[in-house]
Amino acid sequence: MNLDQYLPVLLFILVGVGVGILPMVLGRLLGPVRPDSEKNSPYECGFEAFEDARMKFDVRYYLVAILFILFDLEIAFLFPWAVSLKEIGALGFWSVMVFLGILVVGFVYEWKKGALDWE
């Protein structure tokens, strides 16, 4: 096995890591260190923190995120199908129609269950 072919990949990885780490190291070594109470205090958008930063999130945020990922992933399956529609013929067309039908049924089910309501 010839490992000379992997040298550009290794070089690319090393340069990428160096570009990411080198500015942080240089900033830490060469930057001025003048801590004071204002710099060390927690803030939110320039204001003092109103409450604990570790507040609980509503479950609906996670539900909407999962639903977004689910229906966004559908598009990832539709792009290759649309590109190769002429080659796959009627069987490919109808199989994707069944796939989309299942997704529509799932979407209607979520809508009827109230997963998309914010009240």
UniProtKB/Swiss-Prot annotation:
A Pfam family annotated for this UniProt entry: Oxidored_q4
Transmembrane annotation, as ranges: 7-27, 63-83, 88-108
InterPro entries for this protein: NAD(P)H_OxRDtase_bac/plastid, NADH_UbQ/plastoQ_OxRdtase_su3, NDAH_ubi_oxred_su3_sf
Catalytic activity: a quinone + NADH + 5 H(+)(in) = a quinol + NAD(+) + 4 H(+)(out)
Key word Transmembrane helix present: yes
Gene Ontology molecular function: any one: quinone binding
Main localization (coarse): membrane
Membrane topology per record: Multi-pass membrane protein
EC number(s) given by UniProt: 7.1.1.-
GO cellular component term of the entry, any: NADH dehydrogenase complex
Location(s) in or outside the cell: Cell inner membrane
Keywords: Cell inner membrane, Cell membrane, Membrane, NAD, Quinone, Translocase, Transmembrane, Transmembrane helix, Transport, Ubiquinone
Group of enzyme by EC: translocase
Assembly mode: NDH-1 is composed of 14 different subunits. Subunits NuoA, H, J, K, L, M, N constitute the membrane sector of the complex.
General function of this protein: NDH-1 shuttles electrons from NADH, via FMN and iron-sulfur (Fe-S) centers, to quinones in the respiratory chain. The immediate electron acceptor for the enzyme in this species is believed to be ubiquinone. Couples the redox reaction to proton translocation (for every two electrons transferred, four hydrogen ions are translocated across the cytoplasmic membrane), and thus conserves the redox energy in a proton gradient.
Family per similarity comment: Belongs to the complex I subunit 3 family.
Cross-referenced HAMAP family: NDH1_NuoA
Listed name of the protein: NADH-quinone oxidoreductase subunit A
